[in-house]
UniProtKB/Swiss-Prot annotation:
InterPro entries: Ankyrin_rpt, Ankyrin_rpt-contain_sf, Palmitoyltrfase_DHHC. Its EC number is 2.3.1.225. One of its GO terms (molecular function) is protein-cysteine S-palmitoyltransferase activity. The lineage of its organism: Eukaryota, Fungi, Dikarya, Ascomycota, Saccharomycotina. It comes from the Eukaryota. It catalyses: L-cysteinyl-[protein] + hexadecanoyl-CoA = S-hexadecanoyl-L-cysteinyl-[protein] + CoA. SMART domains: ANK (SM00248). The gene is AKR2. The active site is at C459 (s-palmitoyl cysteine intermediate). Its main location: membrane. This is Probable palmitoyltransferase AKR2.
C-alpha cells in the first residue's frame, strides 16, 4: 500500500464510527489495522479501540507492534478505560512481550500507575512473574518512585502471601531497598525498612544500601540507613568503603552531617553521650538560656554596653555550637532524621528565661519606683504574668489534635481499597507516614509523629504543635504575652525618665552616639542591663505583633498557616507562568517524586506546574533565595496578609492593571463569611454550654465548628457547603 493511500485511510479513521466501520470493512493489511489500533490506544481514543476489537479485525492477544501488544501500551500510557475494556474482552493479563519479556503489570508498575496495577491484579495478573532482568512488581514499583504504588504493593502483594519477598533480588542481586537508596527516595527507603527490608545485603558490585544512598545523595535516606545499622566500613568490589565512596561522589559533607546527627564522629566512631537519658539532655537544653540570661545580666553590670554586647554575642555563639556538638547527639531521634535547636526545648527555655528575667527586673528595679504612680499597671503586669505562665504550662503539655495510629494491616488494606474505589488514593487523601486516610485540613507533623487535625504550625516557644485542640489556647497565650511585653516596655520608659534622679552621678550622663531619644539614652547609660532587656523585649514585641496580625487574618479568613503557604506557593507559580491560581491549591501535588497517578478520565484533576530555581534568571533566582529566607521567619505571610488586607496584590508587583480580578483568597475552598469564621474558631461546638464557656474553653474532642456546622475533624472528608453552594470534598 502506498504512503499516500495509507495517510488518506488514516485520516478517515477520525471521521466517526461510520467511517471507521467502512475502514474496517475494506481489505487493508493487518499491519495497518494493528498500527491504527495501537495509535488509538496511545491517543486514548476508546471509540476507535472498541470499534476495531468488536469488528473482529484484530486479535487483542496477537496485536503486537514494536513487540508490545495493546494492553501493554494501555498500561504504559495510563489508559484506564481502554485497559479495562481490553481485559473484559479477553486480553491476556500475564502475556509477556518486548525484549525483556515484561508483562502489562510490569509496565504499569514501572510508570507508577496505581489504578492500572490494581485493575490488573484484580483480574488475575500474576505478581510473582519476573522480566528478563529478574525484576518483579516490587522492583518496578520502587523504580517508579511513586510512594503510593509502593504502599499498595507492600500491603496487597508482599504482605498478602503472594510469594514476593521484601528482599527479592534481580539478576544483579539488587533488592528493592538498594534501588530505593540509589534513587535517593527516602520515603520508599523508610517504608521498606518498616516492612523489614535487610540493610546488609549487597549486589554483584558489592554495594550495600548505604553505598547506594551515598550515590543517590539524599541525606534523609542516609540517616535512615545509619539508624538501621548499616555498615560504614564494608567495602565494595573496588575496595571502597562508605567514606571513600562519599568522597568520590561528592556527598562527603552529607555523610559527615548524618554521622554527626546520629552520634558518630567523622570516622564513624560512636561518640560517648554526655547524657544517658533523653530527659537529661532536654533539661540541659532548656536551662541553657537561663545561664545565658544570667551571664548577660552580670556582664552588663561591670562592662561598658558595647563590650558587654560583643562578649554576650560571643558566649551565645559558643553556647549554641556547644549544644549542637555535645548535647544534641544525646537526644533520641524518634520522628525526625535531623535534630536542630528549633526542635528542642531551647526556645521554650529562652521564653521562660526571658519571662523570669522580666519579672526579676520588674521586682528589683521597676516596681519600687512605680508602685505609687502606676499601681494599676503593676497589678496588670502581675496578673498577666501569672496568666501567661499558666497558659505556657498548659500549651507545653497539650494535645494539638493528634490522630491515633492503627498499625494493623487489615485497616490499611481496607482504607486503600476504599480510596481506590472512589478515585482518591493519592498523597492528598492518604498519609504515607502513618498509613491512614488523611482528613481534610490535617497534616503530618514530624515533631508529633502523627497526623494533626487542623494543623496550623509548630511553635518552638511552647515546644509543641499548634492544631485543632490547642490553637485557641495558643492565641490566648500570644495575646497575654504581647500585653505583658507592652506593660513592661511602658514601665521601663517611665523608669528610664527617672534614672538621673535614682542614680547619683557626679557628671551628667554621656551623650549617646546612636540613640537620639533622651529617655532611651538615659536608660542605656544609667542601667544597661534593664536597657538590654528592654531592647530584647521590644524586638519580640514587634515580631509577635506581626505574627498576631497574620494569625488574626487567618482566623478572619478561616484558613490555617499551611493553607496560606500553599496559596502563596500557587500564587507565585501563577505569577511566573502568567496563570490564575487554582481554586483549590491546598491539595495540589507537591512534586514529581511524590506524584500520584489516577485514571485518565474527563474529571481528571488539573496538573500542577513546577518551577526550578536553577531555571530562573539570576535576578529571579535572587528573589527566590530571599523568599526562602523570608519564609523561615514568616515575613512572606506578613507581606501576603497586608497585601490582601489592603487589596493591592497586583499593584505591589508593579502592575497597573491586575491580571485577574480576584484576590489570592477569594476562591479558597473553605471561604465563609468572616462572622462565621470567627465563631467557628472562638466558640467550641458545645451549643448547650453558656457562651462564656464556649469562648474560654477548647474542646477536648475532635469536634469543632466549620462553616457554622459541627464537624468531626478526625473524620472530615467532605467540607460543609458554603451558602448557596454544593458540598465540596477533596
Amino acid at each position: 500500500m502506498s504512503e499516500v493511500s495509507r495517510d488518506e485511510n488514516m485520516r478517515g479513521t477520525s471521521d466517526g464510527i461510520g467511517s471507521q466501520a467502512q475502514f474496517l470493512e475494506s481489505e487493508l493489511d493487518t499491519e495497518f489495522v494493528v498500527e491504527t489500533f495501537i495509535e488509538a490506544i496511545k491517543d486514548d481514543d476508546l471509540k476507535v479501540v472498541k470499534e476495531v476489537v468488536e469488528s473482529g479485525a484484530i486479535d487483542i492477544n496477537k496485536d503486537c507492534i514494536d513487540e508490545l501488544p495493546g494492553l501493554h501500551w494501555a498500561c504504559i500510557k495510563n489508559r484506564f478505560s481502554i485497559a479495562k475494556f481490553l481485559i473484559r474482552r479477553g486480553a491476556n493479563v500475564n502475556q509477556t512481550a518486548g525484549p525483556e519479556r515484561a508483562t502489562a503489570l510490569h509496565w504499569a508498575a514501572r510508570y507508577g500507575h496505581v489504578y492500572i496495577v490494581d485493575l490488573l491484579l484484580k483480574h488475575g495478573a500474576n505478581p510473582t512473574l519476573i522480566d528478563g532482568q529478574g525484576l518483579n512488581i516490587l522492583h518496578f514499583s520502587v523504580y517508579s518512585s511513586n510512594i503510593m504504588l509502593v504502599v499498595y504493593v507492600l500491603y496487597f502483594v508482599v504482605s498478602n502471601n503472594n510469594n514476593v519477598d521484601i528482599d527479592s533480588r534481580d539478576y544483579n542481586n539488587r533488592t528493592p531497598l538498594l534501588w530505593a537508596a540509589y534513587q535517593g527516595d527516602f520515603l520508599t527507603v523508610e517504608l521498606l525498612l518498616k516492612f523489614g527490608a535487610t540493610v546488609a545485603l549487597t549486589d554483584n558490585r558489592g554495594f550495600n544500601a548505604l553505598h547506594c544512598a551515598l550515590v543517590g545523595g539524599d541525606q534523609r535516606a542516609i540517616c535512615d540507613l545509619i539508624l538501621s545499622g548499616a555498615n560504614f566500613y564494608e567495602r565494595n568490589n573496588q575496595k571502597q568503603d562508605c567514606f571513600d565512596l562519599a568522597k568520590g561522589m561528592g556527598t562527603k559533607a552529607l555523610f559527615e552531617q548524618a554521622l554527626q546527627h546520629h552520634g558518630y564522629d567523622k570516622l564513624g566512631n560512636q561518640k560517648d553521650k554526655i547524657f544517658k537519658k533523653n530527659s537529661h539532655s532536654q533539661l540541659m537544653i532548656f536551662l541553657s538560656p537561663f545561664a545565658l540570661m544570667i551571664y548577660t545580666y552580670l556582664i552588663s553590670l561591670i562592662l561598658s554596653p558595647p563590650l558587654a554586647i560583643a562578649l554576650s554575642l560571643l558566649v551565645i555563639v559558643v553556647t549554641v555550637n556547644s549544644l549542637k556538638k555535645f548535647v544534641l547527639p544525646s537526644l533520641t531521634r524518634k520522628n525526625i532524621y535531623k535534630v536542630s535547636l528549633v526542635r528542642t526545648p531551647f526556645f521554650s527555655g529562652l521564653f521562660m528565661s526571658t519571662f523570669s528575667f522580666l519579672l526579676f527586673i520588674w521586682v528589683k528595679k521597676l516596681y519600687p519606683y512605680s508602685v505609687f504612680d502606676y499601681t494599676a499597671k503593676d497589678a496588670q503586669l502581675l496578673i498577666t504574668s501569672l496568666f501567661t505562665f499558666v497558659l505556657f504550662l498548659k500549651l507545653v503539655r497539650s494535645d494539638p489534635g493528634c490522630l491515633k495510629m492503627d498499625d494493623s494491616t487489615t485497616p490499611v488494606r481496607e482504607t486503600i481499597n476504599q480510596l481506590i474505589q472512589i478515585g482518591k488514593y493519592d498523597r492528598n487523601n492518604f498519609c504515607v507516614e502513618t498509613l491512614e486516610r488523611k482528613p481534610l485540613r490535617s497534616k503530618y507533623s514530624l515533631f508529633s509523629g502523627a497526623l494533626v487535625a487542623r494543623f496550623n504550625h509548630y511553635c518552638p516557644w511552647v515546644y509543641n504543635d499548634i492544631g485543632l485542640k490547642n490553637h485557641k489556647l495558643f492565641m490566648f497565650f500570644a495575646f497575654s504575652v504581647q500585653y505583658e511585653m507592652f506593660l513592661f516596655m511602658w514601665l521601663c520608659l517611665e523608669y528610664f525618665k527617672k534614672t538621673n534622679h535614682i542614680y547619683e552621678q557626679v557628671e551628667e550622663y554621656a551623650k549617646c552616639t546612636f540613640l537620639k531619644n533622651e529617655t532611651l539614652c538615659k536608660g542605656s547609660n544609667y542601667d544597661p542591663s534593664t536597657f538590654f532587656l528592654f531592647i530584647w523585649i521590644s524586638m519580640n514585641f514587634v515580631w509577635l505583633g506581626g505574627m498576631l496580625i497574620v494569625q488574626c487574618f487567618q482566623i478572619f479568613k478561616g484558613i490555617t498557616s499551611p493553607e496560606l503557604y500553599a496559596l502563596i506557593k500557587e500564587e507565585r507559580k501563577a505569577e511566573a507562568l502568567n496563570l490564575i491560581p487554582f481554586e483549590n491549591p491546598i491539595f495540589s501535588i507537591p512534586n514529581g517524586k511524590n506524584r500520584d497517578t489516577v485514571p485518565e478520565d474527563p474529571n481528571a484533576t488539573t496538573v500542577t506546574h513546577t518551577i526550578s530555581i536553577d531555571s530562573l534568571e539570576p535576578r529571579n533566582r535572587r528573589h527566590a533565595i530571599l523568599d526562602a529566607c523570608f519564609s523561615m521567619v514568616g515575613l512572606n505571610q506578613w507581606v501576603v496578609t497586608f497585601k490582601e488586607m489592603l487589596g493591592i496584590s497586583n499593584l505591589l508587583r508593579g502592575n497597573s492593571q491586575p491580571r485577574h480580578n480576584h484576590s489570592l483568597l477569594r476562591n479558597f475552598l473553605v471561604a465563609n463569611h468572616w462572622k462565621t469564621n470567627l465563631t467557628d474558631f472562638w466558640l467550641n461546638s458545645d451549643v448547650t454550654a453558656p457562651l462564656w464557656q464556649r469562648f474560654f474553653y477548647s474542646s477536648d474532642t475532635s469536634k469543632a465548628m466549620l462553616g457554622g456546622v459541627e464537624v468531626d475533624y478526625y473524620q472530615l472528608y467532605e467540607l460543609p457547603a458554603r451558602e448557596g453552594e454544593p458540598i465540596s470534598s477533596n
